[in-house]
Amino acid sequence: MEALQARKAAEQRARQAAWKKRMDAYRRKLAEEKASSGHAGHFFNVAGHVFQVCIPASLDSQSVLKSYQPFACGPSSDLLFTLSLEFVDDLANVQVGEVKECLNDEPPYFWMFSRDGKYDFGFSYTRSHPDCIVAVSDDFSNAVVHVSSGKPDRYISFAVDNALMLMYAARSIAYDTLLIHASVIRHSDAGYVFLGRSGTGKSTHSRLWLENIEGAELLNDDNPVIRIVDGEVLVFGSPWSGKTHCYKNEVVPLKGIVRLSQ
């Protein structure tokens, strides 16, 4: 019995190694194709998860990916996902199927499309039409975000940021990781998270800590990351901090969560 279990375990490890080898080869091929098509790959590490963003080389990466620079890292074959930015003449030409949902009470509005059992997504400033479309692979390991050509830079950053948050949330959850909507204060090497719906005063509560508690620092003001590592619950800064420019590549143990309501 033990010999049979050992053989099955060895076979499983071999299958996993073969799968990883195929995926590494696929990702290298994808990167080469993007490079040959005039795309530049950029790698970022958020809460220990590395992902790749491929954007046209003609774009100023320091501008489009400004908030990600503190999280920049070297190339990796062990990627959480890869996102590519593509420009199209007309978003209406991107085949995504019928609209199933348009969610959220305020921007960004979140669109869901369904076609032949496959889902794609979109984001927008208004409910009238999507401003970008995110076409994803079945396992969310690869995605392309489509933006109309000639759009102002803010539309490009809007599309990339929201697509990355979608991909990160979907892929990282399998690794004891949550991207949450909250404001986080760091104090005495510990993190305190303030949760609540938009408008309930998360940022205001953090500001009160900053103004009244010595040594308090803002870690992130909109979308921090919580992850369990070796049994310890940690809270990380992220490139996504809403209207507040607070993009800290830092981590502290999570000591408290407060849910605000009014």
Region locations from a protein language model:
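Conserved lysine of the Walker
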Residues: 202
